[in-house]
Amino acid sequence: SNLFTSEGKKILDFTGGLGVLGLGHNHPKILETRINFQREKKVEVHKIIFSKYMAALSSSISYLLPKNLTKSFFLNSGAEAVEAAIKVCFKSFKKPKKYILYSNKSYHGKLIGSGSISGSYKKNNQFPEMKDCISFNFNDPDDLEKKIVEYNSKGGIYCVIVEPYSASLLESCDNNFIEKLFRLKLRYEFKIIFDEVFTGFYKSKKIFYFQNFENVS
C-alpha cells in the first residue's frame, strides 16, 4: 500500500502490519465493516465481558482446525500468546514438570518468559530469564531426542515450543523432525506449542503452517 507524509511525499509500504495482521492501512472493506459495526451500536468486543462475536470467531477457527483443537484464547500480541501457552502447558499436569525446551534458532518475543526461550534473542537479552529453559538444535531430531531423554529424567518436560517455519531464518522444519517430535510427545507426555505468529491464518497454503506436515494431529 502507499502512505503519504504531511508534506505529500509518497511512500511504498511493504509491511502493512506485523505477522498475521498484515492487513494494510485503512483497507476499504475493513473500514466498511468497522463503520457498520459502530452504526448498528453493537457491543464492543472486550476481554472482560462475554462477546458473541468472539464466541463466533472461536467457533469458526475450531471448524478449520483438527477436531481435537476446539478452544481459543484471544490476546494482544504474539509474546502474550506465548506466555499464556506456557502457563497452560505447565498447569495441565497434576504433578508439575520442570523443563521447557526451545530451539536455539527461534524468536518468540521479548517478555521475561518468551525472551527466555528465544534462541535468536538471548545473546542480546539484558533482562532476567525464566529458569529451566533448555535449547535444542534447530530442526535436529537427534538432538531433540537427546535433550528430551536427558531432562525427562531430571524432573520432566512440560512443553516443547517450536516455530514450524522460522520467519527469521526463512526455513521450515523437516517433516522427519515434526514426526519425531510427536512420537516423543506420546512417549514422554509433554505438550507442544506451535508458534505461528508469522505463519498462521493462511500465510501458507493451510490456515496454519503445521497442517502442511504429514501425520500431525
Model feature map: region roles:
Residues S1-L12:
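Active-site and channel-lining beta-strand-loop segments
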Residues K10-K94:
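Glycine-rich loop-to-alpha-helix module at the N-terminal edge of alpha/beta enzyme cores
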Residues L12-T15, Y158-Y165:
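Short beta-strands and strand-loop turn motifs
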Residues S58-C159:
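PLP-dependent aspartate aminotransferase-fold enzymes
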